[in-house]
């Protein structure tokens, strides 16, 4: 896109700044509604570890909110323990578990409770000839070793040595002790020093095939730990997200980014409406009435002008889930709210694809319509949930 500048309000960490009032060539003008300081954008590179990068970013933002200061925590320290937990689960399930690189926020919390955490400078998780993460070969070897154990119906001492050596080779040896800012820690004592309680962080979802205000395990492959989540009506899920962001609590988001309306390159994610012209404004309707549906979509996906979006109901959302159109592709970090010149709400979203893949510092804005349709679940601190909703959930 040949834009001189695409401004996405709040699309920046506490170390970057672009005015929300500047206008981009494509016609999007964003104004801040809520903006929370967070740490810098990282790059998961050639790995399927978005779940860890998003959750780590979320936790780092929590430490900022708590007045603990700025931390750069090691994603790969957590990823390594997640792989260990997957291997255990897969073996107990007779090889029917999940050994992929993906996961969800619960895997981060469990790993943190089990082994603690270390700073990135202590364990960067790259022990091979690269300056970026790449787990393709690592994951292939992991699967091969796991398959042998399943075939033999036994995990020998050599099996455990092979696994440890595999991770040491690709990710580096785990530190028993380390010094950080002049003080000696173990991974567990460093985790304790942060003052975090994983029980404070709540997963919330919204689907109609399960009762509201009760917990269930969303049926997505990356929920291999079968984590129970609270089920809310869709409007209340959005209410939680808004309330949290407006009160200084960021939100970790899991959802579908496979749609054409999701454009990291253009810094936006939208959910165009091309059928119900009667719901459009006069200007939009006059413009879209001259086109067929295909042309309307093509126009919307140029990202050169604002377009009307789908009014997403619980039924529309559920249809996407049950037709497997909506999947748990990706986790990201919601760090604020902006509105465009028409007053449409968007969520400021910190991605983990580095800062070079778009001109907005690695951020984008996802419209409310897109978020309503494509969210699988969110993670938020319990104090970021409105009191009336907490009461309904018994939290």
Where are these regions (language model features)?
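Bacterial Sec-dependent N-terminal signal peptides
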Residues: 1-23
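Active-site signature of cysteine proteases
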Residues: 161-168, 172-395
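Short, positively charged
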Residues: 22-27, 309
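Active-site nucleophile-adjacent alpha helix/oxyanion-hole segment immediately C-terminal to the catalytic cysteine
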Residues: 25-212, 216-254, 358
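N-terminal, helix-rich and Lys/Arg-enriched segments in bacterial and organellar proteins
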Residues: 5-6, 12, 47, 51, ...
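Short, glycine/serine-rich, charged loops/turns that create anion-binding
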Residues: 12, 57, 257-258
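A generic secondary-structure boundary signal that marks alpha-helix termini
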Residues: 16, 59-60, 343
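A broadly tuned, weak detector of single residues within folded domains
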Residues: 3-6, 13, 43, 105, ...
